[in-house]
Structure formats: C-alpha cells, structure tokens
Amino acid sequence: MKIGLILCALTAIATSGCRSNRQEAFDFAGFRRLEPHVIENDLLVGRPSRPMILDSLLIYTDKFEGRLITVLNLNTGSYRRVLSSGRGPGEMMMIRRISYDSKDKTIRLFDNNANRLTTFSATRSFSDLFSVSSIEDVIDFSYDNVPFEMAPFGDGYIANGNFDGRQFSLLDGDGRSTGYFGVYPGNNDDAGSGDAFFMKNQTLMAVKPDQSRFAAAGYSNDQLVFYKAEKSGVPQKTREYFTFDADVETMTHEYGVRVINKPETVSAYMCLYPTDKYLYASYKGRTIEEMMNPDIEKVNYILKFDWDGKFIEGYVVGNIDDFAVDETAGRLYAFVYEDGDNILTAYDL
C-alpha cells in the first residue's frame, strides 16, 4: 500500500484554484511540508479515531470483535484490544473522548451513549491498562443533563454545547454545572434555537494535560479560542482567532438535529491535540465543492500554538484524519484513509 497525494495541476489557473480568495487568519502558503512514513498497514480495522500518546503507547478507539480501544506500544509494535462493548462494569458503548490528566495520572473516557464518564489509572502496566481494577471513578449522567462532549479541566470539567446561548459549561468534580460562559463568534441571531444553533457552530475541544488551559475550534467556522483556568471560577479568554462564520443549514427531526452542508460550506478545523507545551490543530480550509474537485490537492494544515494562543509554526501534511503528537520523539502520528484502508502514518516534525 502506498500513500499518495493528489497534486494540483501545474498551471497558474489550477494552482490558484487550490484555495479560494476568502480571508483567512494564517499564511498557509508559508507552511513547511512534511513527508509521510507508513508505520502500520494492517493494524487498523475499523475507523480509528481519538488517538492519544502516553509515554511510548498510542491509545485510540477502533472497534473490533467487541473491543473498543487499541493500545499500541510504539517501541515494540505489540498491541492489546481492550474495553468490551456493553453497559456492564468496565464496559462502554461509544467513546466520545479520551483525556489525560497529568496532575493525578489518570485517563478519562467519556461515553456519550451510556451517559457515563469513567476514570482509569494511567500508571498501570501495559497488560493491565484499562482493566476493571484500574477504574478509579465513574460519573453517570441523567439523559437530560448529559453534555455533548466533556473533558477534565481545572478542578472539574468543561463541556461544550449551547447553554442559553453560551458556548461552554463549567462543571464541578461531580459533573454538575457551576456556570456558563463563552460567546459564539459571528452571527448569534438564532442562538435561541438550542441544539440546532450548536450543531451549526459545533466546536472541538482540547485541554492541556495539567488542566490549566483549554482551546476550542469550529468545524464549519474558523474560530479558534484559548482559555486559562481561574480560581475565581469563570475561565479567562487569552486569545481568539476568527475570520468567517459557518455557512451550513440544519434540519430538526425526531432523532435530533442534522447538519446539511452546502457546496460553499467550508470545512475548517478537524482535530485538536494538546501536549504539555503546545496545542496542535489540523485545518482543511476548503469548501465542500473544492474537496470534490480532483484537481485540488488533498492536504491538511497543522498549526502549532503555545497555550497563550500565540501561533508558532505551521506544516502541510496529507489528507489525514485524527492525529496525535509525540513531542519527545518529535513525531506526529495520523490515521490516513486511502483506497478503503486505514493506515497508521507518521510525520517527523
């Protein structure tokens, strides 16, 4: 299996068509291109996602034969499939988020199907990681109070959604909301439409491992906002980037809200990954129409920021899905979907 990039036609017209003329917050033309290296062709079996680096381990979701998570030792190539699918003790249904807390050395898994947040010890051995005996805490939410997504932050948790027109909810250690904050960018006229407004302006979140900072970014708008925890309560915004609003439609039906993309809908941020020093963000910045054009190069941009929100540098990579960064090794690991197969790929930073 080879990894290839679909190159733009080498003409002035085709090259200019690789990006539209809309205003953007960063100079993507000046980003450094990274070359891919195939790590594993056969290990990824489903649609792997949510990767996280823990020392020499790559942890990610990839449902296979009733197991939800794969733990791969990057040094030896050995791996384990862990966590059975179900609602019993030590089982999960649908993992929305994998978070690491460096303060207490724990891994938290948020299951938005079972409405449950489970905390595991991260200090266990390779053979005992994610075992039932390694569970340290479980928080169950009622159906009416379960957030769309949540992650440990400060002394509790942070959740995103539409909370009376606010972007985020600050939760205590038991998962109870202590207040809402954050203003959605751009046009807020329909903020009162609840879930429909949130799905239009849906955000990704990433939290610094020591829980002192977090960032959020838009799927269909290019808001990227940084916050730091405050002992007084409401987190303080330290930096925000924003140049264009979401251009999508929403449809409400009996099962919830559906987002409908248009040809001019821009796919903005795709994945955020936090390390001790930096936030890494992958960004497409192309419309649906552009992504369907075979003459336009299929690449993603990786943006690197410090936790105050200062832009450090940028890279150009292939058409990757989710990714994780091993800062010690200076390497970015990504999932690439090509010709019906998922490939674990690495880029040296």
Regions found by a protein language model. Give the residues of each.
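Beta-strand-rich domains and repeat architectures in extracellular enzymes and scaffolds
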Residues: 37-68, 270-288
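Blade-loop segments of beta-propeller domains
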Residues: 78-108, 112, 135-139, 317-322
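Beta-propeller blade signature
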Residues: 171-173, 295-309, 348
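Surface-exposed loop and turn segments in beta-propeller and other repeat-based domains
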Residues: 34-41, 81-92, 130-143, 178-200, ...
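Loop/turn-rich, solvent-exposed surfaces of beta-rich toroidal or solenoidal domains
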Residues: 262-304
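Structural signature of eukaryotic scaffold interfaces centered on beta-propeller domains
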Residues: 47-52, 96-103, 147-153, 197-212, ...
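Asp-box/WD-like beta-propeller blade repeats and closely related beta-sheet repeat scaffolds
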Residues: 121-154, 160
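A short helix->beta-strand "capping" segment at the edge of beta-propeller domains
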Residues: 23-46, 308
